[in-house]
């Protein structure tokens, strides 16, 4: 395989300038064309592509990923009929930034959407541009949460629809059915569910034995509130599975075998807003009859930024060099080849309901993972400025995350749930130093606002009065009266395109 660039930012279609530190980007043209010829009977015509994206669901909460307590028969059946990926990632465990990667093939720092409720840069080309040029109709059916419209120009777009007796709107099944029945040209459709994202179902009298616990939440076994919330979440997962079942019935009724169907979820809920694997690792299952071997598994690192390059190659095109992602088409075709040697993660923690100043960056290969928390208690003093009002919010952010150290290093082979920090262990010094070097090289190539030797800590905001300001109350955090409205425009880095 001519793999494109090997570096990628951690981790449902798609999120880099040339990244020198991550390895050479290759074109994938010649070897992939050979593999395409091998599969010519299956993809001699452009296949239809459907990407189903759930909302806020842990990779650990599926039957096919080992949780026998949750009911996910439709996803489990897809895995049985296709391929299950064990190392698929998004770069940000939050809605808009995660989706922006799928749709652009670029990490959030490069595409501009690196905080929630913000927009992609207006000069970015998305899936709607790239796939249209390759002869596809590009459709969004369900939740969007991406902007601006000039970047995301869907050929057809249908909003979620209200449904009685359930906590969230449904995907637009009637519109999907009518479209699939009458489709005249190849299409790329994103079906974006609002499940299982809260508000969850109200489950009466749940028991701890109904829930599967993991090292990151086993201390909650006697927490009645947690158990009730988790039971409602499991029930919401079932409701999403019901919608997925209906979609698959429509696909099997109206479409040929020449249809690639991918299921994923935008990020985990247990690690939401973090760069831990419980937030960034995502479920990723694909079915493509006559191309994907049923019941197969891949342990290769793939990333949401790889989705658009893959779709473009399947459609007969070439993906541009400034995309961060690589095509994983060879994996779908049964070849065990490396797509990425790294994936990366971003944590902003500003412009959200619980806004605090606590940015993080992460780099991960198949075994080791390094995290830098730039405003930890350990280093907060060096982040302070000559402005008392700014310093209050810098210190507040560090205290809000007082249990998160400046550096984290994990051996994921022996510690998959990141319970034992090895950052200060001298036996891992060389591993840590290499990861640090490569992470900061990647950050520089991405145009990150953070750097290794920066002075202070950036405070970011959308222009004007929009967004969740650090010095104003939100529904989830209160600011002392004396600190309200004390920050000025000059205290912030204003992100103009937000």
From Swiss-Prot:
EC id: 3.1.6.-
UniProt KW keywords: Calcium, Hydrolase, Metal-binding, Periplasm, Signal
Active site location: 95
Main location: periplasm
Binding note for cofactor: Binds 1 Ca(2+) ion per subunit.
Names of required cofactors: Ca(2+)
Binding site for Ca(2+): 55-56, 95, 266-267
Disulfide bond residue pairs: none
Signal peptide stretch: 1-22
A Pfam family that the UniProt record links to this protein: Sulfatase
Statement: the UniProt record of this protein carries the keyword RNA-binding: no
Family: Belongs to the sulfatase family.
Job of this protein: Sulfatase involved in ulvan degradation. Ulvan is the main polysaccharide component of the Ulvales (green seaweed) cell wall. It is composed of disaccharide building blocks comprising 3-sulfated rhamnose (Rha3S) linked to D-glucuronic acid (GlcA), L-iduronic acid (IduA), or D-xylose (Xyl).
Record protein name field: Ulvan-active sulfatase
Organism: Formosa agariphila (strain DSM 15362 / KCTC 12365 / LMG 23005 / KMM 3901 / M-2Alg 35-1)
């Amino acid at each position: 395989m001519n793999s494109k660039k090997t570096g990628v930012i951690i981790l449902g279609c798609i999120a880099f300038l040339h990244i020198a530190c991550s390895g050479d980007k290759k074109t994938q043209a010649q070897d992939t064309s050979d593999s395409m010829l091998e599969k010519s009977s299956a993809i001699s015509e452009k296949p239809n592509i459907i990407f189903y994206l759930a909302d806020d669901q842990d990779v650990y909460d599926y039957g096919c990923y080992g949780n026998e307590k949750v009911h996910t028969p439709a996803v489990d059946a897809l895995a049985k009929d296709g391929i299950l990926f064990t190392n698929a990632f998004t770069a940000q465990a939050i809605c808009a930034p995660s989706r922006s990667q799928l749709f652009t093939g670029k990490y959030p720092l490069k595409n501009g959407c690196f905080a929630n409720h913000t927009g992609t840069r207006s000069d970015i080309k998305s899936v709607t541009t790239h796939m249209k040029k390759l002869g596809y109709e590009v459709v969004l059916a369900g939740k969007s949460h991406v902007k601006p419209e000039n970047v995301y120009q869907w050929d057809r777009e249908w909003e979620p629809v209200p449904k009685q007796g359930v906590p969230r709107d449904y995907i637009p099944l009637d519109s999907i059915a009518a479209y699939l029945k009458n489709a005249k040209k190849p299409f790329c459709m994103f079906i974006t569910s609002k499940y299982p994202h809260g508000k969850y179902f109200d489950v009466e009298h749940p028991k701890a034995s109904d829930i599967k616990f993991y090292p990151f939440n086993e201390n909650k076994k006697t927490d009645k509130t947690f158990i009730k919330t988790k039971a409602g979440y499991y029930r919401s997962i079932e409701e999403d599975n019901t919608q997925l079942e209906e979609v698959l019935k429509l696909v099997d009724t109206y479409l040929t075998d020449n249809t690639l169907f991918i299921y994923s979820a935008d990020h985990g809920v247990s690690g939401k807003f973090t760069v831990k694997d419980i937030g960034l690792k995502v479920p990723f299952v694909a079915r493509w009859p006559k191309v994907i071997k049923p019941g197969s598994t891949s342990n290769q690192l793939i990333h949401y930024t790889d989705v658009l390059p893959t779709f473009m190659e399947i459609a007969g095109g070439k993906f541009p060099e400034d995309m961060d992602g690589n095509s994983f088409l060879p994996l779908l075709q049964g070849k065990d080849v490396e797509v990425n040697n790294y994936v990366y993660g971003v944590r902003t923690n500003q412009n959200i309901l619980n806004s605090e100043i606590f940015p993080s960056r992460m780099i991960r290969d198949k075994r080791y993972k390094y995290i830098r928390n730039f405003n930890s208690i350990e280093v907060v003093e060096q982040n302070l400025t000559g402005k008392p009002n700014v310093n209050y919010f810098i210190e507040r952010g560090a205290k809000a995350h007082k249990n998160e150290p400046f550096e984290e290093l994990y051996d994921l082979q022996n510690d998959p749930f990141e319970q034992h920090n090895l950052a200060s262990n001298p036996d891992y010094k060389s591993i840590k130093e290499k990861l640090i070097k490569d992470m900061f090289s990647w950050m520089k190539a991405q145009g990150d606002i953070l750097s290794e030797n920066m002075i202070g800590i950036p405070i970011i905001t959308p222009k004007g009065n929009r967004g969740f300001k650090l010095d104003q109350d939100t529904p989830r955090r209160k600011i002392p009266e004396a600190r309200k409205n004390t920050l000025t425009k000059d205290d912030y880095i204003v992100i103009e395109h937000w």
